[in-house]
Design a protein with these regions (language model features):
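Gram-negative outer-membrane beta-barrel transporters
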Residues: 577, 704, 708-870
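Transmembrane beta-barrel wall of Gram-negative outer-membrane proteins
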Residues: 237, 260-338, 355-384, 573, ...
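Periplasmic N-terminal accessory/gating domains of Gram-negative outer-membrane beta-barrel systems
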Residues: 59, 82-84, 88-105, 110-231, ...
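Solvent-exposed loop/turn elements at secondary-structure boundaries
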Residues: 406, 433, 442-453, 583-614, ...
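Transmembrane beta-barrel strands of outer-membrane/channel proteins
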Residues: 117, 240-246, 285-289, 330-334, ...
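C-terminal beta-signal and adjacent terminal beta-strands/loops
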Residues: 704, 854-885, 899-906, 910-968
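Short, acidic Ser/Thr/Gly-rich low-complexity loop/linker segments typical of extracellular
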Residues: 48-63
């Protein structure tokens, strides 16, 4: 009842002016010849991306304001009878306010003059750690072609070349929020960046690292990056470009890996925009086609199939102003990606295990704003995100599998049974070593003339269909009342996933060699891990798809109060999350509250509004309008969670299963993976949260120089994970941690409806801490720009979402990872220490200079500390488990070791060949990693696997890119 009441109140508030996500604003004060405030002045704002101009009248205090302006170039004109007219040109930035003050002169001594307004480069009323970057900066710097490439410009955010997981900036790489035209393009339920809109479509970028207000529903546990796409303007403009990077333009890969290939890449872009109906309707359209090929591939296993990736993406946008006070934007993006020969990038993986992928992405947005009065504004946004993906091995096996023992594992052809992990000898295990010797001889790779274990051969293990959807609707109402800027907002969103996953043959196969037994004492020699959806029933059918859903609501109220030299921000965000799975139905007569109902959608858990109240408090003091001291306190409840799938009861019918075989390949037992099934929730869970404290100082030294410095502290707590119900007693949790089960009567629940011995629990004393001290400086000249930043930080704790498995550059379950998954993976098992995202020192410098010969030069430089890592070894926990897996079993404190520091310099030169006043041919050359610093990271840290301590990934070598653009 409480939830519905809050929702109704929020809806009422907004239906009765927010800084809409995709807009900026202009404000200022007009004075007369004597310096006194000048009321009644007509101020008009004309923009190249705003079809119709807007007007405002200055108040009794001479103040004026334009809200909800699309970012772009504007001209302000000021007129009052008896005084000379004035006009000023300026650029409105995304989520930024531009302040323009004007002093008007008597008409008899003044003539209209248009000048470029000197805009303050810092917002002395804001406590946010934020920055805006427009297309002029992006185009003149050595920045890549994808949305992800822009992240490297953010101060204090680690430079990363990982392709899936986001970089860290005081939180998990899965807690960042990525917005494009206000659309959350993060992968539903996982929080990684799933969409890669072309940077050519981006007009401006805005980044908020901390100190967020209760505006735009910011729940990010990391950073939030938003961008606004290009729009049509009052002139027809277009561009055709082609960019290339051949293998010959790429330096030799100076790595420790024996994986070799020749990679060619190119990017094609076409865009065009302009007015459809003058002063009413503008359009913009683009086509983007990046391709990547890897030829002549080889590794320790020999030749590897060539791989290819091709993407075709179209984008269209309309900007409509039916009246001077109404602005409507609509856009649609459609992308199709086809990839073949993937997944074989490691040196020790046979090319026969390659996989092909296909993905489609569709994004629809509709947003609008209405300037109801000079002091009140209403805005709305609707977004629809659809990402359909599929993946299947390039080599498919054609035999069915069963769990009744009628289908054997063909031990004489293990490379035709699934993905086979070749074992390695273990010191002192003579019987085991003798058993695996012929397997290494047949399936191992040859190194120095000797067959060697530790590699992977066979075929790809899994066939997957994975579709993601997100719908979101939000409303916002802003009102200026004296010294108060009031904001009210409501958001409703739904994240969905549909998953069908089957195994190719027996899936993934490992060798236990008789070191473990089934309950009756029979030795296990082989273990296969396969998907239950692969198993046929007596009718020859398999389980249907798993549907998972997360529904969220948020209400926000914010008041920005200006009192003399002080600005206070008081805000609150209240959120409600509902997690839905499949396979159960509510039944109050049962102790568990549920009954089995295959295919039925049920609410597995709810976090109510009163459990996720997020205060946003801040204060700034600016004694002179150019210096500002600020402080803020905020709490964030990150929205991303994988539990709607990971804990769904449907996983009991569609879970991962371990099959155990004897030396001849006879199935002697099966054991559903306990963490891969439906789970109950511990009672009284507190949602995970991030508390943040900031103090800072900013100063506009002069019209060109700005300086910012801050200190920030973040504390993460109340982390949820799936874990053994009896983990605390079974794996000897230290005092003062309780030895009790998380759910004392779990066995009674399971007697009714089954389920896992694992539960979703709030892990005892789980935490992260992040300390940061940073300084930034900006310099803007008439033909140049420079930005420098240095950040010291320390990120540590005992819960590392970024370091839970072997391949962390992936969509890892949030709330159901390897953390706390059985023996050796509990938080008291060496997990306290430096986290994977810790980068103690980071320096970034970038800028550009425009020459007087139609050329420009840009540069980007970064230095950062290395990546923490530690050894993993199951033998440390041998008395607790018979497993052979080192994965996520820390043999020493987290982050005990660190890779080498990384630094690199990227360069750009651009030259324009102007043809008349309308056309331009632009040639641009980029050099990335000019010093060819190929630092290794992503260490192979499994003690019992080949090449312990060696780097599995390296920063890309020196590479050149050449682009030609025809602009008109």
């Amino acid at each position: 009842m409480k939830k519905h009441l809050i929702t109704l109140i929020g809806t009422f508030l907004i239906c009765v002016p927010v800084f809409a996500q995709q807009t900026g604003s202009i404000s200022g004060k007009v004075t007369g010849p004597d310096g006194d405030a000048l009321p009644g002045v007509t101020v008009e704002a004309k923009g190249d991306v705003l079809p119709r101009p807007r007007t405002a009248i200055t108040s009794e205090t001479g103040a004026y304001r334009f809200q909800l302006l699309p970012p772009g170039n504007y001209e302000l004109s000021f007129r009052l009878d008896g005084l000379g007219p004035q006009s000023k040109e300026l650029r409105v930035l995304l989520q930024q306010n531009s302040s323009v003050d004007v002093k008007m002169q008597l008409e008899s001594i003044s003539e209209e003059v248009s000048v470029v307004a000197e805009i303050p480069l810092i917002d002395v009323t804001s406590t946010e750690i934020k920055a805006s970057i427009d297309s002029e900066v992006i185009e003149q710097l050595p920045v890549g072609q994808e949305y992800r490439d822009l992240v490297k410009l953010i101060p204090g955010v680690q430079y990363s070349e990982e392709e899936t997981r986001g970089p860290s900036a005081g939180g998990s790489g899965q807690d960042n929020v990525y917005l494009f035209d206000g659309v959350n393009v993060g992968l539903p339920l996982f929080g990684t960046l799933s969409a890669e809109p072309s940077s050519h479509d981006i007009a401006q970028v805005s980044i908020i690292k901390g100190g967020a207000k209760a505006v735009d529903f910011n729940r990010s546990g990391g950073f939030t990056i938003d961008s606004v796409s290009r729009s049509g303007t009052d002139r027809y403009r277009g561009e055709v470009s082609y960019q290339i990077q051949t293998d010959g333009m790429t330096g030799n890969r100076d790595t420790e890996s024996d994986a070799e290939f020749e990679r060619d890449r190119d990017w094609s872009v076409v865009n065009f925009g302009g007015p459809l109906v003058s002063e009413n309707l503008y359009f913009y359209a683009s086509y983007y086609r990046p391709t990547t090929t890897r030829d002549n591939r080889s590794n320790l296993y020999g030749a590897v199939p060539d791989s290819e990736s091709t993407r075709d993406e179209i984008f269209g946008k309309l900007t409509f102003t039916p009246s001077n006070s109404i602005l409507i934007n609509g856009s649609y993006r459609d992308s199709d990606t086809d990839e073949s020969g993937n997944s074989v990038t490691a040196e020790d993986r046979n090319g026969t295990a390659s996989v092909g992928d296909d993905a489609t992405l569709k994004i629809l947005t509709l947003d609008g704003s209405w300037v109801a009065t000079e002091n009140s504004y209403l805005s709305f946004k609707f977004t629809d995100f659809q990402n359909e993906t599929s993946s299947q091995p390039d080599n498919l096996l054609n035999f069915p599998i069963r769990s009744d023992g009628t289908v054997q594992l063909d031990v004489n052809n293990l490379d035709r049974q699934g993905t086979f992990s070749v074992p390695q000898p273990i010191a002192g295990e003579d019987a085991f070593n003798a058993f695996i010797a012929p397997l290494i001889g047949r399936y191992g790779f040859i190194e120095n003339g000797v067959a060697t274990g530790g590699g992977v051969t066979g075929v790809g293990s899994t066939i997957s269909l994975n579709d993601f959807n997100r719908e979101s609707f939000q409303l916002a109402y802003d009102h200026q009342l004296g010294a108060h800027d009031l904001h009210f907002g409501y958001q409703n969103s739904s994240d969905e996933e549909d998953l069908a996953r089957t195994s190719n043959g027996w899936g993934s196969i490992t060798v236990l060699g008789g070191r473990s037994t089934v309950p009756d004492g029979t030795p296990i020699f082989y273990e296969a891990r396969f998907e239950q959806q692969s198993l046929e029933d007596v009718a020859g059918t398999i389980s249907p798809v798993i549907n998972s859903e997360l529904q969220s609501q948020s209400i926000e109220i914010n008041d920005n109060i200006k009192l003399n030299n002080w600005t206070f921000n008081i805000g609150i965000v209240a959120s409600n999350d509902e997690l839905f799975g499949q396979g159960l139905r509510e039944n109050s007569s049962n102790l568990s509250g549920f009954e089995l109902a295959p295919g039925n959608t049920y609410k597995m858990y709810e976090v109510d509004f009163d459990e996720m109240i997020q205060p946003r408090l801040g204060a700034t003091w600016s004694p002179n309008g150019v210096d500002s001291v600020f402080a803020s306190v905020a709490r964030y409840y990150p929205a991303a969670s994988s539990l709607p799938r990971a804990a769904s009861w449907a996983r009991n019918l569609r879970r991962s299963i371990r099959g155990f075989f004897d030396a001849q390949g006879n199935l002697i037992g099966v054991d559903p993976v306990r963490s891969s099934s439906g789970k109950f929730f511990q009672e009284g869970l507190t949602p995970r949260s991030i508390d943040e404290y900031i103090i800072g100082y900013s100063k506009q030294v002069n019209s060109r120089w700005t300086l910012k410095t801050h200190a920030r502290y973040r504390y993460g707590q109340n982390f949820w994970e799936d874990t053994n119900n009896n983990a605390r007693s079974r794996f000897e949790a230290p005092a003062p941690i309780s030895q009790a089960d998380y759910i004392p009567n779990l066995s009674d629940f399971r007697d009714e409806i089954g389920g896992s011995s694992y539960v979703i629990a709030e892990l005892d004393d789980a935490f992260t801490k992040y300390y940061e001290a940073g300084v930034e400086a900006d310099w803007r000249g008439s033909n140049s720009y420079f930005k420098g930043s240095y950040v010291w930080s320390h990120y540590y704790g005992n819960f590392d979402q970024d370091n839970s498995t072997t391949s962390n550059d992936a969509n890892v379950f949030i709330g159901s990872s390897f953390i706390a998954d059985g023996a050796g993976r509990q938080l008291w098992n060496n997990r306290y220490g430096n986290l994977r995202g810790d980068r103690r020192h980071q320096l970034k410098l970038y800028g550009y200079y425009n020459f007087n010969w139609n050329g420009s030069a840009g540069a980007y430089a970064v230095y950062q500390s290395g990546q923490p890592w530690e050894a993993w070894d199951v033998e440390v926990y041998r008395r607790f488990t018979g497993s052979s897996s080192d994965t996520s079993r820390f043999a020493e404190p987290a982050g005990s070791r660190t890779t080498s520091d990384h630094y690199q310099i990227d360069l750009n030169y651009t030259h324009n060949f102007k043809i008349g006043g309308r056309y331009n041919i632009q040639v641009a050359a980029d050099v990335f990693n000019a010093l060819d610093r190929q630092t290794g990271y992503n260490i192979q840290n499994k003690v019992n696997s080949a090449n312990f301590g060696s780097s599995r990934s390296f920063f890309d070598p020196r590479r050149f890119q050449l682009a030609v653009k025809f602009q008109f």
